[in-house]
């Protein structure tokens, strides 16, 4: 479970975008981990991006991810993020989000 929602507001023209890091964690070599985060308002358009934070390398992709969603209540959504480590070393990650308005 992930409950670490921090955000910054970014304004471009008349559009407001909320950016933040929901959680950080680690994924062991050649394996996958799954996290969830709940109670997101259904009217928000949320985009998820997962980035490796270490180790630093310049060879090939370290991770891939997929996002699934569940309607938690009539007004709230729960997101599931499955993150796969493509490398032979443990990778630390940040799960970042953007709420588009």
Predicted regions, residues:
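Extracellular attachment/recognition segments
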Residues: 2-94, 98-101
């Amino acid at each position: 479970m992930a409950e670490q929602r921090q955000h910054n507001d970014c304004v471009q023209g008349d559009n407001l975008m909320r950016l933040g890091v929901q959680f950080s964690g680690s994924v062991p070599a050649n394996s996958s981990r799954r996290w969830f985060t709940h109670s997101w308002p259904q009217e928000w358009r949320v985009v998820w991006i997962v980035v490796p934070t270490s180790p630093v390398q310049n060879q090939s992709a370290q991770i891939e991810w997929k996002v699934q969603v569940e309607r938690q209540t009539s007004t709230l959504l729960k997101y599931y993020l499955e993150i796969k480590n493509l490398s032979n070393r443990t990778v630390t990650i940040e799960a970042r989000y953007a709420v588009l308005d």
